[in-house]
Amino acid sequence: MAKKIVGYIKLQVPAGKANPSPPIGPALGQRGLNIMEFCKAFNAATQKMEVGLPVPVVITAYADKSFTFTMKTTPATVLIKKAAGVGKGSAKPHTDKIGRLTRKQMEEIAQIKMPDLTAADMDAAVRTIAGSARSMGIEVEGA
C-alpha cells in the first residue's frame, strides 16, 4: 500500500543555503517533518548549482512523518535579470527599458527552463522567455 500523503509544501529556497530558520523551519515543523534532514538533503542535491540562486521546491509530506521533495528550475525572471545584468525589473516596463537580451542569451535560459515549460519546441520556449523579459522592461533582440 502506498503511503498516505498529508500535504504539499511549496517553497523557494536558495541553492545550498537551506537552514532551519524561517520560512523552512515553520513550514516543515507544522507537518512534524524533520527539518534538519530536509536541509541536509536539499543542500546535498543543490551543491552543483550556483549558491544562492532561488530553487522552487515541492515537499510531499506523508502520514508517517517522512517526506520527499522535487526541485523545479530557477524562476525565469531570476535568470533574465542575471543575464541582462539588472537588479530588478522596470517600474514602467513598456516605456522605460532597463536592459537588453540577445537571442543567444534567451536560448540559454530556455534550455535551462525547458523541463518546466509547456513549450513544444525550443523556438516556443524562447518566445516565452522573450515575453517574460519584455514584461520586465528588458529589450529583446531577434525574437
Curated annotation (Swiss-Prot):
Belongs to the universal ribosomal protein uL11 family. The keyword Ribonucleoprotein applies. GO terms for cellular component: cytosolic large ribosomal subunit. Keywords: Methylation, Ribonucleoprotein, Ribosomal protein, RNA-binding, rRNA-binding. This is Large ribosomal subunit protein uL11. One or more lysine residues are methylated. InterPro entries: Ribosomal_uL11, Ribosomal_uL11_bac-typ, Ribosomal_uL11_C, Ribosomal_uL11_C_sf, Ribosomal_uL11_CS, Ribosomal_uL11_N, Ribosomal_uL11_N_sf. NCBIfam families: L11_bact. Forms part of the ribosomal stalk which helps the ribosome interact with GTP-bound translation factors. One of its GO terms (molecular function) is structural constituent of ribosome. PROSITE patterns: RIBOSOMAL_L11 (PS00359). GO terms for biological process: translation. The gene is rplK. Part of the ribosomal stalk of the 50S ribosomal subunit. Interacts with L10 and the large rRNA to form the base of the stalk. L10 forms an elongated spine to which L12 dimers bind in a sequential fashion forming a multimeric L10(L12)X complex.
